[in-house]
């Protein structure tokens, strides 16, 4: 399974940035995470580690990370890479995660549930990430007793996760639908089929840079295969709508669209100050140009990397010091200029 940041698939016009699976699990006869004190939570962590690291090669390929040992910037870097959730960070005093060396598998411990198995990769590859997450789940279940009800399925802290405990999501770049204000029209339609649309960092986040996450909202009464099949079909429909919208834009406003795209590239190559929001918006315009074949000398993987590396915590780490907002904006602009200079012809 490839790291989504270093993967750029031309299938579906490059619109699909990543596919992710999360499986919510809880240990039997133990209260949910929010009911546990620090000592009890650390026992859960130890139980999960003992169950996982008994298998061969796991200690060589995986590493435990304890959030109480990390500073805020380190935690936010993992969040910016989509490796952990905001909820896990909120539980820092009693939370941990096990991460593989390719940064594609993350087992979050003491988030909303005792265990959240997450697998993420590039492109529209829901079946692949589900297969990997299911294998991890089976390994853990060999040594852990899960909270499971014969009628309801897996028991979870949030009622919407009861059942399969499966949350599948696909991250999409939808600039044309955003520009035409068509995203809101999808909200009601998605809700009616048990799906939802969120921003770049999931629940409660904004769709900065025209990046959206489409995911299932309900797991009870539906099989894993049904959830994945429905989500994939829906994503393909949305991709088709985005492509049609782009074609219409190109027909009606060809010069204006090309001007917008090349101006964005020009600003990114020459700006002295860039805040994170402006940077993501400009990167979206350039990504649109790459996806439509208008810009031919920018690498799609470079844009994926900049999507992460231009974020506040990662910029702070790259320049190795506590930066003021203005200094961070200065260094972000410098970093983007240098990356685009190297990765353009």
UniProtKB/Swiss-Prot annotation:
Looking at the record, the residues that make up the Phosphagen kinase C-terminal domain are 15-245
Known catalytic reactions: L-arginyl-[protein] + ATP = N(omega)-phospho-L-arginyl-[protein] + ADP + H(+)
Q: Does the keyword Lipid metabolism apply?
A: no
Q: Name one GO biological process term.
A: phosphocreatine biosynthetic process
Q: How is its activity regulated?
A: Appears to be allosterically activated by the binding of pArg-containing polypeptides to the pArg-binding pocket localized in the C-terminal domain of McsB.
Its EC number(s): 2.7.14.1
Q: Name one GO molecular function term.
A: ATP binding
Q: Give start-end ranges for motif RDXXRA motif of the pArg binding pocket involved in allosteric regulation.
A: 328-333
Q: Name one Pfam family in it.
A: ATP-gua_Ptrans
Which SUPFAM superfamilies does this chain map to? Glutamine synthetase/guanido kinase
One GO term describing the cellular component: extracellular space
Q: Which UniProt keywords apply?
A: Allosteric enzyme, ATP-binding, Kinase, Nucleotide-binding, Transferase
Q: Does this entry carry the keyword rRNA processing? A: no
Ligand binding (ATP): 18-22, 82, 116, 167-171, 198-203
Query: What is the similarity comment for this entry?
Result: Belongs to the ATP:guanido phosphotransferase family.
Briefly state the protein's biological role: Catalyzes the specific phosphorylation of arginine residues in proteins.
* Name of protein: Protein-arginine kinase
Q: Which organism is it from?
A: Clostridium kluyveri (strain ATCC 8527 / DSM 555 / NBRC 12016 / NCIMB 10680 / K1)
Organism phylogeny = Bacteria, Bacillati, Bacillota, Clostridia, Eubacteriales
Protein's gene: mcsB
């Amino acid at each position: 399974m490839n790291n989504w940041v270093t993967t750029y698939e031309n299938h579906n016009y490059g619109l699909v940035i990543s596919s992710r699976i999360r499986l919510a699990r809880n240990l039997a006869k133990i209260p949910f995470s929010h009911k546990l004190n620090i000592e009890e939570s650390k026992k859960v962590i130890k139980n999960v580690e003992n169950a996982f690291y008994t298998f061969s090669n796991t200690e060589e390929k995986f590493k435990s990370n304890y959030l109480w040992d990390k500073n805020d910037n380190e935690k936010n870097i993992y969040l910016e890479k989509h490796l952990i959730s905001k909820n896990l960070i909120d539980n820092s005093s009693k939370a941990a995660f096990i991460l593989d060396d390719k940064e594609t598998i993350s087992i979050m411990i003491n988030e909303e549930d005792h265990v959240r198995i997450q697998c993420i990769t590039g492109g529209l590859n829901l079946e692949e990430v589900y297969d990997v997450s299911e294998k991890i789940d089976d390994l853990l279940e060999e040594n852990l007793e899960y909270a499971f009800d014969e009628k309801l399925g897996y028991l979870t802290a949030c009622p919407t996760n009861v059942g399969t405990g499966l949350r599948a999501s696909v991250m999409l770049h939808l600039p044309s639908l955003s520009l035409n204000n068509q995203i809101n029209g999808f909200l009601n339609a998605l809700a009616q089929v048990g799906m939802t649309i969120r921003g770049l960092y999931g629940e409660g986040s904004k769709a900065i840079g025209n990046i959206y996450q489409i995911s299932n909202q309900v797991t009870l009464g539906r099989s894993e295969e049904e959830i994945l099949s429905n989500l994939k079909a829906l994503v393909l429909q949305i991709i088709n709508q985005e492509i049609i919208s782009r074609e219409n834009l190109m027909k009606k406003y060809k010069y204006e669209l090309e001007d917008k795209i090349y101006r964005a590239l020009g600003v990114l190559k020459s700006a002295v100050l860039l805040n994170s929001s402006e940077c993501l918006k400009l990167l979206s315009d350039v990504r649109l140009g790459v996806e439509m074949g208008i810009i031919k000398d920018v690498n799609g993987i470079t844009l994926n990397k900049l999507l992460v590396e231009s974020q506040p915590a990662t910029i702070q780490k790259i320049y190795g010091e506590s930066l003021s907002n203005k200094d961070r904006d200065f260094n972000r602009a410098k970093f983007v200029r240098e990356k685009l200079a190297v990765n353009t012809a």
